[in-house]
A protein has these predicted regions:
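A conserved beta-turn-beta hairpin within the catalytic core of GNAT-like acetyltransferases
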Residues: 71-82, 92, 139
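Conserved acetyl-CoA pyrophosphate-binding loop and the N-cap/start of the following alpha-helix
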Residues: 91, 95-103
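A short helix-loop-beta-strand connector motif used in the catalytic cores of GNAT acetyltransferases and
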Residues: 42-54, 81
Length: 145
């Protein structure tokens, strides 16, 4: 059975291992201080815009999701950006990612936020199969600086 809960301060090493796996998928590496700072923000009671939820199977952390509440100029309510979602490779196909996204939907609803959005790379076919079932594909293209 999948257990979903908020990230806790004593989760650092298990969280870091999962996040490193996520970043490796996208061929990205970060400095150690970025891991520490991000983790501290995600666990902080003073920073309520950045959040993290983890999934456990048999007491082992097997998935994570990071999400951010932020204002939107076209709405009165905040919206939620689901920034990072990762399931340990050996646990894929067991409903972990869907459970994590559902938890973000629930947090968004509880906060009165009408919209949750996220991005993925075009080649991420396995994830896109799930996203096509629980979200709506938009025609937007992302640019960055």
């Amino acid at each position: 059975m999948i257990t979903i809960r908020s990230l806790r301060p004593n989760d650092y090493h298990a969280w870091q291992a999962l996040w490193r796996g996520y970043l490796a998928f996208y061929k990205t590496e970060l400095a150690e201080h970025v891991y520490r700072t991000t983790f501290e923000r995600l666990c902080s009671n003073d920073i309520t815009t950045q959040n993290a939820i983890i999934a456990q199977l048999g007491g082992e952390m097997v998935g994570l999701v990071h999400y951010i509440f932020h204002p939107h100029n076209w709405r009165v309510e905040d919206v939620v950006y689901l920034q990072d979602l990762f399931t340990a490779p050996q646990q894929r196909g067991k409903g972990v990612a869907k459970a994590l996204i559902t938890a973000v939907y629930h947090a968004s609803d509880q906060a009165g936020c009408p919209s949750v959005y996220w991005m993925t790379q075009e080649f991420n076919h396995q994830a896109r199969h799930l996203y096509d079932q629980i979200g709506q594909l938009t025609p937007f293209i992302k640019y960055t600086r």
